Each structure stands twice: as structure tokens, then as C-alpha cells.
């Protein structure tokens, strides 16, 4: 498809909208929506009404529940940029609260070591990190495999608590005693992570 013209838009024209989401990435998305909607003839009031009615989507900083004062989030982030933007947004939404990142290398991107350094740096933005085994590891040539143990070792060198655990139960056994009221636990996976969200909430409800 060929574009016959290019238009440039100034930021002030599309600033000042209120959106019910946190994070710079969501603000940029909202600005792009406002540009498109304006081109389609919608007024500023109509655009704002649309933002006001938007409640977000599942698996994007989705609150799965709260127990014992701990908030458990689910997020689909499975590449370094998404992890960075989401952890920053969590800190914006939940200021002065500890953020724990639980990461499952399950997507084709995160199972491979092409982003080993970037994934490590992204997760290190959290206050504590748990990484589980690489999904379907045997399908990958050894030289392409992500090394979660090395990720954890590097994060520890930065002074952050980090642990590699083979499965969800092992993570929960280690993590649950460390949690305190006000903590935020963010689960990052493009899969179900062995139901870790509900299992964590169940454990916390018994504390």
C-alpha cells in the first residue's frame, strides 16, 4: 500500500487528554489514537469521552486480586521494551511500594538468548526478581538458549534479590514469606505460568 501524503502533527494539539491508564507507553498510544480520531472528524469532547469509557484490556497490568495487602498483577509483556515500560508504569501507579517481578521465558523471543542482556536489565528495574525455567527448552539449539541462572546472577550483582526457580510452586515457597503489606507482585508471561497468580493469592489469603 502506497501513502500519497504525509502529515505532521504538533504535540500541543493533542496534549491534555485524560486517560485511565498509567505509563508513558499508554500516553503515546493515546496521542496516536487522538490523531487518528481527529482525522476521522471526531471532536476533542468525543475523543475524551472515548478515553473516559475505556477500562483497559486483559493481561495488561491487569489486577488479578489482592490478599494480605499484596496486589497481584498479570501482564503479557514478553520482550525487553514491554518489561521496561510496564515496570515503570507499575511504579507510577503504585508509588513507594515494592515491586516483585515473576518472569516466565515462554515466548519465542524470550526463550532465546538474543535478548539475554536486555531482559536482565529490564527485570532489574524491579525490587525483587524470580525467573523460572525456559519453556520447551529442548526444542532450541543449546547455543540459542536463554540462560535464566545467569540472568539471576547478574541481577544479584546489582544488589537486587533474585532467584531462579524451576516451577511456580518453588517460586511461591520462596516468595510468600518475603512479602509484606503494600507489595506489588507482577507476573510476566504470555502463558498461564502454571496458574501462579491464583496460587499466590490463595497462599496469601491463608497468612
Language-model-derived ranges and their functions:
Residues 1-2:
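Short, small-residue-biased leader/transition segments that mark boundaries at the very start
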Residues 17-24:
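A short glycine-threonine-serine/GTX helix/turn-capping micro-motif
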Residues 25, 32-207:
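ATP-dependent carboxylate-amine ligase
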Amino acid at each position: 500500500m502506497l501513502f500519497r501524503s504525509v502529515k505532521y502533527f504538533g504535540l500541543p494539539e493533542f496534549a491534555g487528554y485524560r486517560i485511565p491508564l498509567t505509563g508513558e507507553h499508554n500516553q503515546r498510544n493515546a496521542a496516536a489514537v487522538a490523531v487518528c480520531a481527529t482525522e476521522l472528524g471526531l471532536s476533542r469532547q468525543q475523543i475524551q469521552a472515548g478515553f473516559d469509557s475505556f477500562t483497559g484490556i486483559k493481561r495488561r497490568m491487569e489486577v488479578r486480586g489482592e490478599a494480605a495487602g499484596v496486589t497481584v498483577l498479570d501482564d503479557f509483556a514478553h520482550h525487553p521494551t514491554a518489561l521496561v515500560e510496564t515496570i515503570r508504569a507499575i511504579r507510577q501507579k503504585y508509588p513507594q511500594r515494592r515491586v516483585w517481578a515473576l518472569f516466565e521465558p515462554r515466548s519465542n523471543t524470550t526463550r532465546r538468548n538474543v535478548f539475554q542482556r536486555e531482559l536482565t536489565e529490564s527485570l532489574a528495574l524491579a525490587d525483587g526478581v524470580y525467573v523460572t525455567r525456559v519453556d520447551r527448552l529442548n526444542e532450541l539449539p543449546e547455543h540459542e538458549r536463554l540462560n535464566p541462572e545467569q540472568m539471576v546472577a547478574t541481577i544479584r550483582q546489582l544488589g537486587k534479590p533474585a532467584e531462579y526457580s524451576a516451577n511456580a510452586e518453588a517460586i511461591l515457597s520462596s516468595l510468600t514469606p518475603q512479602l509484606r503489606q503494600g507489595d506489588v507482585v507482577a507476573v510476566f508471561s504470555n502463558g498461564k505460568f502454571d496458574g501462579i497468580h491464583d496460587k499466590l493469592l490463595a497462599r496469601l489469603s491463608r497468612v
